[in-house]
């Protein structure tokens, strides 16, 4: 019997060859992880893609400094004033009356400012917005916001009007996350995780921007496709006859089954779950999915919608990785992105013949 503590044998030629193969795979895996991992954010307009990109900056790049936060003030003020103007105009269109003592404020918002707001939220303008937000007519109009185009952040900024109208106001990270501006062109966020470089590419989602998507399709490790769960009862900004959820389903089918992404991980973010959970208590998802006959609950409805998207996949060998998300909730996105990171890193290693 040989000495088990003696010098190890080199092994048979087969064992040596197998060991060399393993070392080669490890080298390939290390090389892949040291390379750049490209994540492509896709989805229709208003689905929350840009908010996800902002969260990556908060989570992985030390957030926004004061100068960067300050640069969002004008956007936030434009969102706030613009949203109130939308409500005032919608009230008139829907023939919902505004209190007599608030009609002058409504006129100033709708007529005097028009589309020429200069980005300065004066004390007088803030008071007009505060008074109108408390007006029963504006509240009734807000309850019917599925009938017109209103930013998701409207109520958040109206409720914060005293704070955001202070002379020394500096936007918080939450204020920045909720700010909305149309994404045009291509915006990239680069960050490091576990010695791997991630490049997240955000491309505008509205129809006019989608022609730019093809420029980003090469060397993509994973697609993160964002869908706004809460928009099952809304129409597109670009086309007021097309349901937003149906547009997202059609778009996901195209992206999921394109030859460009035949071997690319497909991650599905079912976003705005917080707004969705409130909305389904008032508006059934049958306004979009007439065939749905399940319970009108968050769990039942979200599971049904998730399955509708998974069913768009025509490749039985391709996996879809769905997640319910709230893009404005940093803790939720941290947890979800940790799962995404593990999926992506495992798939990257898998391509080299190794699994974590």
UniProtKB/Swiss-Prot annotation:
Give lipid-anchored residues (S-palmitoyl cysteine). Answer: 5
Q: Which GO terms describe its molecular function?
A: G protein activity; G protein-coupled receptor binding; G-protein beta/gamma-subunit complex binding; GTP binding; GTPase activity; metal ion binding
Keywords (A to Z) from UniProt = GTP-binding, Hydrolase, Lipoprotein, Magnesium, Metal-binding, Myristate, Nucleotide-binding, Palmitate, Transducer
According to its UniProt entry, one GO biological process term is: adenylate cyclase-modulating G protein-coupled receptor signaling pathway
Renumbered to this chain, region (G1 motif) spans 38-51
Region G3 motif: list its residue ranges: 198-207
Task: Locate the residues binding GTP.
Answer: 46-51, 152, 177, 183, 205, 271-272, 274, 327
Domain G-alpha: where? 35-355
Q: What does this protein do?
A: Guanine nucleotide-binding proteins (G proteins) are involved as modulators or transducers in various transmembrane signaling systems.
Which region ranges are annotated with the description G2 motif? 175-183
Q: Name its co-factor(s).
A: Mg(2+)
Where a lipid (N-myristoyl glycine) is covalently attached, the residues are 2
Name recorded for this polypeptide: Guanine nucleotide-binding protein alpha-1 subunit
Q: What are the annotated GO cellular component locations?
A: cytoplasm; heterotrimeric G-protein complex
**Pfam families (alphabetical):** G-alpha
> Which family does the UniProt entry place this protein in?
Belongs to the G-alpha family.
Chain spans, region G5 motif = 325-330
Annotated Mg(2+) binding sites: 50, 183
Under PANTHER family, the record lists: GTP-BINDING PROTEIN ALPHA SUBUNIT (PTHR10218), GUANINE NUCLEOTIDE-BINDING PROTEIN ALPHA-5 SUBUNIT (PTHR10218:SF302)
Q: Where is this region: G4 motif?
A: 267-274
Listed CDD domains:
G-alpha
> Assembly and partners?
G proteins are composed of 3 units; alpha, beta and gamma. The alpha chain contains the guanine nucleotide binding site.
């Amino acid at each position: 019997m040989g000495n088990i503590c003696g010098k190890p044998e080199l092994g048979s030629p087969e064992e040596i060859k197998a060991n060399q193969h393993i070392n080669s795979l490890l080298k390939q895996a290390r090389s892949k992880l040291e390379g750049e991992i490209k994540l492509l954010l896709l989805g229709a307009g208003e689905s929350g893609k840009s908010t996800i990109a902002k969260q990556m900056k908060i989570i992985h790049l030390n957030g926004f400094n004061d100068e960067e936060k300050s640069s969002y003030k004008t956007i936030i003020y434009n969102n706030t004033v613009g949203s109130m103007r939308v409500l005032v105009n919608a009230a008139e269109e829907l023939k919902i009356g505004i209190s007599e003592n608030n009609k002058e404020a409504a006129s100033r918002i709708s007529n005097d400012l028009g589309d020429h707001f200069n980005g300065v939220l004066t004390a007088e303008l803030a008071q007009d917005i505060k008074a109108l937000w408390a007006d029963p007519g504006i509240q009734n109009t807000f309850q019917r916001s599925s009938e017109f185009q209103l930013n998701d952040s409207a109520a958040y900024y109206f409720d914060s009007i005293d704070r955001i109208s202070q002379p020394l106001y500096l936007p918080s990270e939450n204020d920045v996350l909720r700010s909305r501006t149309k994404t045009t062109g291509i915006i990239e966020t680069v960050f490091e995780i576990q010695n791997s470089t991630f490049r997240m590419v955000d491309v505008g989602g509205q129809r006019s921007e989608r022609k730019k998507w093809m420029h980003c399709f090469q060397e993509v490790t994973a697609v993160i496709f964002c869908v706004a769960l809460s928009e099952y009862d809304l129409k597109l900004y670009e086309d007021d006859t097309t349901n937003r959820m149906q547009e997202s389903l059609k778009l996901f089918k195209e992206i999921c089954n394109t030859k460009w992404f035949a071997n690319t991980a497909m991650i599905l973010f079912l976003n705005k779950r917080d707004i969705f959970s409130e909305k389904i208590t008032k508006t059934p998802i049958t306004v979009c999915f007439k065939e749905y006959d399940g319970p009108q609950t968050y769990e039942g409805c979200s599971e049904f919608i998730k399955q509708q998207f998974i069913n768009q996949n025509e490749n039985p060998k391709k996996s879809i990785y769905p997640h319910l998300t709230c893009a404005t909730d940093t803790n939720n996105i941290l947890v979800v992105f940790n799962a995404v990171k593990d999926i992506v890193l495992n798939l990257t290693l898998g391509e080299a013949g190794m699994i974590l």
